[in-house]
From Swiss-Prot:
This is 3-hydroxybenzoate 6-hydroxylase 2. Belongs to the 3-hydroxybenzoate 6-hydroxylase family. GO terms for biological process: catabolic process. Gene3D superfamilies: FAD/NAD(P)-binding domain. It catalyses: 3-hydroxybenzoate + NADH + O2 + H(+) = 2,5-dihydroxybenzoate + NAD(+) + H2O. Keywords: Aromatic hydrocarbons catabolism, FAD, Flavoprotein, Monooxygenase, NAD, Oxidoreductase. GO terms for molecular function: 3-hydroxybenzoate 6-monooxygenase activity; FAD binding. The keyword Chaperone does not apply. Its cofactor is FAD. Signal peptide: none annotated. The gene is hbzD. Induction: By 3-hydroxybenzoate. It comes from Aquipseudomonas alcaligenes. InterPro entries: FAD-bd, FAD-dep_Monooxygenase_BioMet, FAD/NAD-bd_sf.
Length: 320
């Protein structure tokens, strides 16, 4: 971790595992993860994809759930897993709350290795922090590409969504940072812009034979870098709950919910605090740097054991 005036505040050996049985930290391209999941779903022979389809209405009884799309088509099943994102129709049906727009904007771009500065080709996730902004970069696909992610606190009113980014806008927020970090801002030929949002954690997301998963259940800011990870954990936990309870969907969905609510709520709330720490200024910045510098490597790993110590063998433990 470096400040945007080039002074290093703290570094950690991310290749080292959190505990003796854990695997080292790895980063990969999200598209590659999507393709692996798609291939796995197709290989089962049980999955039928309906694209360009929006759920408009949900009905359920004691034995089944039926969803109706925008064209009036009905789809009936034994359960409904709402994994339909931040603006979840399934969540809106049963919870009826609204996303909390943070005012923090994220710009993302991927750059080929040959275009990335030689002196910044570190085989690690690297974080530059500054007042009301931060910048992250890390290698993808064995170092053949680098992901650049910059975040700033917007000067304007934001609405949640993803749009094409403006090079002029992102440069205007990072014009005063040190040259070594600022050179990264000019590399991408195009940017994607996210106006971020989360939601308040809720104590229930299973309703009869319907439940929520991923961003539909617990949308979070990017500061813990756990949005996609939590969705994958949800899926694994749901699978384990079904293994325990067989075809009893009521018990399985209840076990799944009880296993996930506390952990995912902690991610959402921790993300908000990490955003404050990353963007600290003035005396608060000095306190942050002092706290991070004062931790030993062992203390650092102890502090994140709760996050990275999760695995399939303990995923149901919080509910028991």
């Amino acid at each position: 971790m470096r400040s945007t005036n080039t002074r290093s505040a703290r570094s950690r050996p991310t290749k080292r595992s959190v505990n003796a049985s854990a695997t080292p930290t790895q980063s990969f391209h999200r598209v590659d993860a999507h393709l692996s999941l798609l291939e796995g779903a197709e290989e089962t022979g049980w999955v039928e994809f309906k694209t360009n389809t929006r759920v408009e209405r949900i009905e359920q009884d004691a034995d089944s759930v039926t969803v109706y799309d925008q064209n009036g088509n009905a789809y009936r099943g034994v359960a409904l897993i709402g994994a339909d994102g931040v603006r979840s129709v399934v969540r809106q049906t049963y919870v009826n709350d609204q996303p909390r727009v943070t005012g923090h904007v994220v710009y993302r771009a991927v750059v080929d290795k040959d275009e990335f500065p030689q002196d910044l080709r570190w085989n690690a996730s690297s974080l530059w922090v500054g007042p009301k902004c931060h910048l992250v970069h890390y290698p993808l696909r064995g170092g053949e590409q680098y992901n650049i992610v910059v975040t700033f606190q917007s000067r304007q009113q934001e609405e949640w969504g993803v749009t094409e980014g403006s090079k002029e806008e992102v440069e205007s927020y990072f014009q005063d940072i040190c040259p070594k970090a600022r050179q990264l801002i000019g590399l991408p030929k195009s940017w994607k812009r996210w106006a971020t949002a989360d939601r308040e954690p809720i104590p229930q997301w299973t309703f009869g034979r319907t439940t929520l998963l991923g961003d539909a259940a617990h949308p979070t800011t990017q500061y813990m870098a756990q949005g996609a990870c939590m969705a994958l954990e949800d899926a694994v936990t749901l699978g384990e709950a079904l293994r325990v309870h067989g075809n009893d969907w009521g018990k399985a969905l209840d076990l799944y919910q009880r296993s996930r609510i506390t952990r995912t709520a902690r991610i959402v709330l921790s993300g908000r605090e990490m955003g404050r720490l990353y963007h600290a200024q003035g005396v608060e910045r000095l306190v942050r740097n002092s706290l991070w510098k004062g931790r030993t490597t062992e203390q650092f790993y102890d502090a994140i054991q709760w996050l990275y110590g999760w695995n399939v063998d303990n995923c149901l433990s919080e509910s028991i």
